[in-house]
A protein has these predicted regions:
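C-terminal secondary-structure termini that scaffold catalytic or DNA-interacting sites
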Residues: 2-5, 13-17, 22-28, 83-86, ...
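Short, glycine/charged-enriched secondary-structure capping and boundary segments
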Residues: 70, 90-91
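A generic "functional-site adjacency" signal
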Residues: 1, 55, 69, 101-102
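Short, basic (Lys/Arg/His-rich) helix/loop patches that form interaction surfaces
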Residues: 8-28, 33-77, 81-84
Length: 133
């Protein structure tokens, strides 16, 4: 819900090409993978020691697993991690665990909102907000 509301609002600012996050040098192209890190550095973060763009993915992955609610396979599919087992990789489809992933992403958005008010661990938040029950 939260992401759709934000993206819908941002879409009104999109140019003719329909991109919401346009590149700084060419508005016809999307932002690069380095844009988030540059923004963090502008805000005063050391992207080699404190936080980096990829670190947000690692944080989300760890928190989702720590909550104990979601299967590792669903988390891995959501993060688009590559399967290390070659045989298994041949049978994995990107569309796996779609319903669980939908619930997981809504739980993640709600978890982030809850942490605006007061810091709470993923494990503790899962006790009071379990969409699987």
């Amino acid at each position: 819900k939260q992401a759709v509301a934000i993206l819908t609002e941002l879409q009104t600012w999109a140019g003719e090409n329909g991109l919401i996050f346009t590149g700084a040098h060419d508005p016809r192209k999307p932002i690069s993978e380095n844009t988030v890190n540059k923004a963090l550095r502008v805000m005063g973060y050391d992207t080699t020691q404190e936080v980096c763009g990829h670190g947000f993915r690692a944080m989300a992955c760890s928190a989702l697993i720590e909550s104990g609610l979601w299967s590792r396979d669903a988390v891995e599919r959501q993060m688009s991690h590559q399967e290390r087992n070659g045989v298994r990789a041949a049978y994995i489809h990107k569309a796996e665990h779609l319903e669980e992933r939908r619930l997981m992403l809504q739980w993640w958005a709600d978890f982030l909102d809850a942490n605006r008010e007061k810091g709470i661990s993923p494990f503790e938040y899962a006790k009071i907000n379990n969409p699987l029950k």
